[in-house]
Amino acid sequence: MSETLFERAKLRIPGGVNSPVRSYDPYPLFVSSGKGSKIVTCDHDTLLDYCMGYGAVLLGHAYAEIIDSIKLQLDKGTLYCMPTEQEVELAELLCKTIPNTEMVRIMTTGSEATMHAIRLAKSFTSKKKIVKFDGGYHGSYDDVLVNAGSGATESSPVEDILFESAKNTLVIPYNDLTALEELVKIHSDIACLIVEPILANMGLIIPKQDFLNRIRRITEENGILLIFDEIVTGFRLSIGGASEYFGIRPDISTFGKALGNGFPLSAVSGRKGMSNSWISSI
């Protein structure tokens, strides 16, 4: 059944999948349902799910309490384009949970969150360049997709196209403090450094001892905002994410679908001192 569905999909969906990471030979397994830690494929095989939405489905598939809440909300409507009490409650909860968080902007996707976090940093600092680490994945938009550790975007012509769009993106090796120190000597117009506290898209690469502390110190000394991309690490390393686990206080943090156990939900969090930029940029 999965093989047949893949052949049908290739006729209408580029590559037969809606994300390059879902494509593998000879064909991907198509899923019909999931419950708890297991999924059932369209081939009627029950499998233990080690992926769990790339970590977003923290509580398991079809978690009863969340499903019940969703069903209740569906009867009340789904899109108002107006504020709700629930978003205020979520912002308040995140401010209590995430270190160094005084303001929160709620969104729907991880890419949207990191994009707005970078825009916030550029607005607040009035600088235009960003620093990311080789292999770090921060979303599917051009500014950060270069050297993202995904095979689908690592070869020409995609890299050639991204190069022009990402000309203000500076890429250095992860865990390489010397490279960062040399970079800030050369470039005085760096708005922010964005980092996955634990590099996930090219394998789980743990930061060397004192690495995160040092990049916090270097960014502070050079007027560069530090962004923790916690799309993967948020609520997993600890309830307060990598920021709490490592004891580092970034200026801005981003969180993804783990906020909603896999539902489209994301957030940007940070300090209240950037309030004017919060309002004008995101």
Q: In which residue ranges do the predicted regions lie?
A:
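Conserved N-terminal phosphate-binding loop of PLP-dependent enzymes in the Aspartate aminotransferase
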Residues: M1-I282
